[in-house]
Amino acid sequence: MITNWQYNNHGNLRDSVKKLIKENNYTSIDVGATARYWSYPECKTVVDSYPVPENDVLYFNVNIENINDWTSVFEYVEKNGKFDYSICSHTMEDVFNPLELATILQKISKRGYIAIPSKFNEFTKLFSNQYRGDAHHKQFFDIVDETLMVFPKFNWIETDNRSDLILKNYVANELTLFWEDELPIKVFGDGKPFIGDDSLINAYYNQLLS
């Protein structure tokens, strides 16, 4: 379950996460750490497709998006048990299948910390091209009924007036959550069909603005 979540400014909780790992002597693993390996030295196990420069780290060379590439990690966990703690910071928004990644996190760890750009960040025109959010992000997230909800980045967010309504309630640019045992997650719509585009778009904004 999600034990705590909040909107924060980017990186606010990093020291708290490191302190939590150190004080509890948790075995820990950082998934997708290479771009910003802030969890070192408290966390010395890394999964990513590029190695970290630190030489005292257990590194698994894994394409995070390819489930078949995770074999070495799964074998390690089978032999040594689940990690006490996992970190997945600014990675879930980049992958094509965040539900699969969430399943993997639960398979390899007992609990964890996830940081992702907030919906406010993804609706903000961040760069000179005036597009909303980061172009390489494939989806964004919010917490709905204590569940991590995945919202596809549909093209209509660029022009629909309701996108600016979301920004009127701006809180912070990062969504952070702590989970334990299970990580509840689902995709907006939950596989149910919508009758026409208007139904889909209205439901999308109603959920985000509620």
Residue ranges and their predicted role:
Residues 1-22:
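Class I SAM-dependent methyltransferase Rossmann-like catalytic core
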Residues 99-210:
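S-adenosyl-L-methionine-dependent methyltransferase catalytic module, highlighting the catalytic core
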